[in-house]
Regions:
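Active-site diphosphate/adenylate-binding microenvironment
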Residues: 377-401
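Well-ordered alpha-helical scaffold segments within catalytic/enzyme domains
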Residues: 373-384, 428-441
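Extracellular/oxidizing-compartment recognition motifs
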Residues: 1-362, 369-370, 386-389, 401-416
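Conserved small/polar residues in nucleotide/adenosyl-binding loops
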Residues: 442-447
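The substrate-binding groove and active-site-proximal loops of carbohydrate-active enzymes
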Residues: 415-418, 437-438
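Short alpha-helical patches at coil-to-helix transitions and adjacent helical residues
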Residues: 364, 368-371, 421-429
Length: 447
């Protein structure tokens, strides 16, 4: 399959803290003369969810692979079955890595690649006569604002259930009032098929306690983990529910001092940090699951609900991370050593989102020195070599013309003047060596 010729977007306006721009829906209806197999190639600058005839077919969550689009643009492929007659492709875009002002401490708000989310897609199939057809991203696609009013990879989401558009991605939906998509410029980065393991939900947790406080209801899930909360509520029209996440308690409430950027914009950031917001439409049971963010937390403070709504069934934690296969483990007669192994593994998986990050609640950055030090024990426990290989490509691409590396990869350009140096550069030696030790890699093909 050839890479799509065109990227499209809803508009050039992108989301900021001061001016919220909703995540866009895009759709394209087309006719097929018989049931047929088809191949889809799709990428996005930002995150995407892909739908065919109303069914979400996305591989995992937070797709595609997170990268600097000036260096690498990753795409995914799908095999699908088209029905005879009308078919509908739907794409929902989130800001992802392309527009994450919540990372302003590392200059992501001023990144050269910062832009509105956009996508490129090509679906190919063969008709009854044997003629090949391609449905491609272009200006014939229709677009409309979704109920996701604000999404930031690091901070959270604001979703308004009153603005949902039932059937937007299904057959027979009238999109005549939607505007046409516009063409976007091609990113500079190399286009590559993603071979790293996808991120997906691996477990569900229910609260071990629910406690009433002056600020709302405190949900304790018993363990520090990473993912999102699925909210299930019978709410009233216009009821606004806020979920504030935290790893520890301070004065009986989730503490944010370890994740709150106390520099410029500190008051603004406190309003958004580690928080998801849902407004109810009030027509029965409503379910909301954040799509384009994740959090590191144990506790969730829920405000805006009644005592009757504050049940154990209100929230379910969806634990997420890269789907790395189990490789090894450790146990012995010493329970302290066993607990250390358990804690280490939990830390590893909750920080592995395509590549090893430093923390799932604040930075979500790929610090190279951290990864170099942790790679030995991670590879003893988990089959992470495919993800490591993909990340090594990004590391090589991040080098400047003098060969210097930033301290974090991917980066906006930050990290060449602080937080780097020999200890961080060692990832180019340490990581390939640990891959050789673990799975006998004798070469790494990295252009």
């Amino acid at each position: 399959m050839e890479f799509p010729k065109s990227f499209i977007r809803a508009s050039e306006a992108y989301n900021t803290f001061e001016h919220h721009v909703p995540a866009p829906y895009l759709r394209r209806a087309f006719q097929v003369d018989h049931e047929a197999k088809a191949n889809v190639i799709i990428t996005a600058l930002g995150f995407y969810e892909l739908y065919l005839n109303g069914e979400c077919i996305t591989k995992g969550r937070l797709a595609p692979y997170i990268s600097n689009p000036d260096d690498l643009v990753y795409y995914d492929t799908y095999e699908v079955t088209l029905r005879a007659g009308e078919n509908v492709l739907g794409v929902w875009l989130g800001n992802g890595f392309t527009n994450n002002p919540g990372g302003h401490i590392w200059d992501f708000d001023t990144a050269a690649f910062r832009a509105a989310p956009q996508m490129a897609l090509c679906l190919t199939y063969t008709d009854k006569s044997g003629e090949a057809h391609c449905i491609e991203s272009d200006e014939t696609w229709r677009t409309e604002s979704s109920p996701l009013l604000f999404d930031d990879y690091r901070f959270g989401e604001i979703y308004d259930g009153r603005l949902e558009i039932p059937g937007w991605n299904t057959i027979g939906f009238d999109d005549s009032a939607w505007k046409f998509a516009e063409r976007a410029s091609q990113p500079r980065g190399e286009k590559r098929l993603c071979t790293a393991e996808p991120i997906d939900i691996v477990n569900e947790l229910k609260p071990i306690s629910v406690t009433k406080t002056e600020k709302g209801y405190l949900y304790d899930f018993g363990i520090n983990t990473a993912g999102v909360c699925r909210l299930c509520v019978r709410g009233e029209l216009d009821q606004r529910i806020e979920l504030r996440h935290g790893e520890h308690l301070k004065d009986g409430l989730p503490g944010v001092e370890n994740i709150w950027f106390k520099r410029e914009h500190w008051a603004r950031d406190l309003e958004y940090v580690h928080k998801d917001v849902y407004t109810c439409r009030g027509d029965g049971e409503e379910v909301y699951t954040p799509a384009y963010t994740y959090h590191g937390f144990r506790y969730v403070l829920v405000s805006g609900i009644t005592e009757a709504q504050a049940t154990e069934d209100l929230l379910t934690v969806l634990e997420m991370h890269s789907l790395l296969e189990e490789r090894g483990g450790f146990s012995c007669s010493d329970e302290t050593a066993n607990k250390l192994q358990q804690m280490t593994r939990q830390s590893d998986v909750t920080n592995f989102y395509y590549f090893p990050t430093d923390c799932p609640q604040r930075e979500k950055n790929g610090w190279t020195a951290d990864a170099a030090l942790s790679s030995e024990h991670i590879l003893l426990n988990l089959g992470a070599e495919r993800s490591y290989r993909e990340w090594l490509r990004a590391i090589v691409k991040a080098q400047d013309n003098n060969g210097a590396l930033p301290g974090i990869v991917p980066t906006s350009g930050w990290g060449f003047a602080w937080g780097n140096g020999p200890a961080w550069d060692s990832v180019l030696i340490e990581l390939p060596y640990r891959l050789y030790q673990s799975v006998s890699y004798t070469h790494l093909t990295l252009p």
